[in-house]
Amino acid sequence: MPMPKRASVDDYFAQLEDVQRPHLEDLRRMSLVAAPGAREELKWNLPVYVVDKNTNLWMLQNFTKHCSLRFSPDFFATQKAAVEAAGFDSGAGFVKLPYDRELPTDLLESLMQARLSDHEASTADQV
């Protein structure tokens, strides 16, 4: 079944299924706290947290039985071992978060902070 077209980030969250809503709303809150200067933008029909002109920090994705917090594959490769050590499945750039498990907030906040540090280091190299 194709994903419904969303008009905005708020519309994305409004269209979530009941089982999806708690995890994704928690991820949204965590994202806004971790990166207060980031903009929420709808890209690829999904919420993306963006800084500077167009740097994507991370993206939220919803699926039938899980959601994902997605980063660039290059960045996530440096974090994948910590995700797997915490007992969560991962792939090329994402941590898989089943709806029937509690969100690993410490792990997710750590990933977000690491991505922000990675971004700050990359922009410092350009100066």
Predicted regions located by residue number:
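Charge-dense, helix-prone N-terminal extensions
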Residues: 1-127
